A protein has these predicted regions:
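Histidine-acidic metal/acid-base catalytic patches
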Residues: 1-27, 49, 83, 89-91, ...
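Pocket-edge positions in alpha/beta enzyme catalytic cores
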Residues: 8, 36, 66-70, 103, ...
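N-terminal substrate-binding region of glycoside hydrolase catalytic domains
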Residues: 20-37, 59-63
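Conserved beta-strand positions in the central sheet of alpha/beta enzyme cores
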Residues: 32, 56-59, 94, 130, ...
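Glycine-rich, aromatic-flanked loop segments that form ligand/cofactor-binding clefts
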Residues: 48, 52-56
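Active-site acidic/histidine proton-transfer and metal-coordination neighborhood
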Residues: 50, 67-164, 174
Length: 246
């Protein structure tokens, strides 16, 4: 189990030539980010290569899974995002599922149908798609996929091992709590974690989530993947207090 750093959260507006050596100095060799279309991809590619780092994942762009009329646009965006992933030697893409359509059961069927349409692209491009539930109470009102075990049941119906769950500990603490039980129940589908303090999405130790304990228990469950650090350091940039958790 290792950490990756979300550049958009920890290093907003910081030049990659400054951010990546800082991350390397902290003993972390893996980064992730949100959107690719607003980035200087040549500069990112150069900085990652020079600092011998891995791009773990980033978000696919275009279309909406919860809206059937948008599935063709979604698949086109997935194709384009796949080419960017290959350029960055990245094997994982993050997807959100889009807005609730009014009928939740139908919304889930729409998402399931859209995800099943991704099979051919993911197989051909040798990629993993990470589906992310989000909280609707604070950050994403109207979002379609909220609860971790509902997401796991959805992925079981989709039935493609290349389509996995992104379990965001911050979002799930707000949405449902009881994190370790939900992690244990969802573990066969989890391909990535995100972490942030439950208080204002700040430092990991800000709020009621005991992250040192949480990370230890997740590792004991047998998880060998990555935990993405997606917290916002309260007006500062970079790690600062992260070493206390390592």
């Amino acid at each position: 189990m290792k950490y990756s750093v979300c550049l958009d959260a920890l290093y907003p507006g910081v030049d990659l030539a400054q951010a990546l050596p800082d991350i390397r100095e902290a003993g972390i060799d893996t980064v992730e980010f949100w959107n690719w279309s607003n980035r200087d991809l040549a500069a990112l590619e150069k900085a990652v290569t020079e600092n011998r780092m891995e791009v773990r994942c980033f978000c696919t762009e275009g279309g909406t899974l919860s809206l059937p009329q948008s599935h063709d646009e979604y698949l086109s965006g997935l194709e384009h995002s796949a080419q960017i992933a290959h350029r960055l030697h990245c094997r994982r893409l993050i997807t959100q599922t889009g807005p609730e359509t009014g009928d939740h059961a139908q919304t889930l069927r729409n998402i399931e149908e859209g995800l099943k349409k991704c099979d051919e692209i993911l197989e051909r491009e040798d990629l993993i798609l990470l589906v992310e539930p989000l909280n609707t109470r604070i950050d994403h009102p109207g979002y379609s996929l909220v609860y971790s075990e509902e997401a796991a049941e959805l992925l079981e119906r989709v039935g493609n091992p290349r389509i996995q769950l992104l379990f965001d500990l911050y979002h799930q603490q707000i949405s449902e709590g009881d994190l370790l039980r939900h992690v244990q129940n969802c573990l066969p589908w989890i391909g990535h974690f995100h972490a942030a303090g439950s208080q204002n999405r700040g430092y990991l130790e800000d709020g009621e989530i005991a992250y040192s304990y949480m990370f230890r228990k997740i590792k004991e469950m047998g998880y060998e993947g990555c935990i993405g650090l997606e917290y916002f350091p309260n007006g500062e940039r970079g790690f600062n207090r992260l070493p206390e958790l390592k």
